[in-house]
Amino acid sequence: MKVLSLFNGMNTGRQALENVGIKVEKYYSSEIKPYAIELTQYHFPDTIQVGDVTKWREWDIDWKSIDLVLSGSPCQDLSAAGKRAGINGSKSSLFFTFIEILEHIKSFNPNVLFLQENVGSASKLDVGIMSRALGVYPVRINSSLVTAQLRDRYYWSNIRVKETMFDLVTDIPQPKDRGVMFKDVITDGHVNCDKAKCLMEGTISKNSSKTPNSFSHQEYLKKRERIGMLSLIYEENNELRVKTNTKQGYDIVTENDCIDLSFPTSTTRRGRVIKGKSPCLMESNNNLYSYKNGIVRTVNQIEMERLQGFPDGYTSILSKSKAGSLLGDGWTLPIIEHIFSFIKPI
């Protein structure tokens, strides 16, 4: 199979194809982030990097040979976490570049397969626009079925379709629920605070870092305090609490809960304590915390990998921030494996 992957990110598509036993002859990757390219070439050095997607007409590709096109066009303008500029926003409008490329390939190979992914919080209007452009309506799958992460996504594909009375729809069934919970992805070394940031209101005395007075630790706390994070978590009546905009005014944190401190300055925020699962990883991922053995700390790199279904250490050649950026922007590996399992032999 010859594959063209647009907005390739951390190369989840290639890994998923390998995992389900589909032989890849050539894999073209369009990606501009240097650390994403570094990770891709580390795992799959035969990947052919073609560069900026907006310069696709300059690419040296045998277009008629492409069997599968993958696209995870930027979703920032569609996401509930973004500014809701919509499909015509400066980033999400790259979807139409994907459409141009797909139509170009179809002129040589009408049977080319495709997969397009985008956020579940996209508006009905934008979903309709994308569906009409692709000629098929999406299936909606939450990664919580196969991982410990709540990650709601739309997937458009002609890998398997069915006709309804009015439309053609993506006919990928829901994957079986694996029952993976947040507590299942927390690493055994949870209480080793030399490698974890412990966050509590004010200075941390109980169950704090072994080096609470170190310069880096204090600077980290100061940064979090400046944006309001430390004042959100506090102890009272032998309970760990997180401030929320509810009648009670707080949520109680219990063992193995995930704490979401995104939008720390919001005065209307609810649901900061998530039971059982983690909220969706995002590109800026430093706002998720785990609570275990009296310790509150940021999720570590291995835990982020597990939340997206990757093997431990998959991103170990990168820093935590760079790995988190790719994982937060990327696809959930077991979901893509599930979709690709329906590809018929060529």
Name what the model sees in each region.
Residues 1, 24-26, 46, 63-66, ...:
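A general structural motif
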Residues 4-55:
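SAM cofactor-binding core of SAM-dependent methyltransferases
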Residues 29, 50, 70, 115-116:
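Generic enzyme active-site microenvironment
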Residues 35, 204, 332:
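Conserved Rossmann-like nucleotide-cofactor binding loop
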Residues 56-68, 75-280, 296-297:
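Class I S-adenosyl-L-methionine
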Residues 294-317:
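FAD-binding beta-loop-beta segment adjacent to the flavin cofactor pocket
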Residues 320-321, 331-337, 341:
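Catalytic phosphate/metal-binding cores of nucleic-acid and nucleotide-processing enzymes, i.e., regions
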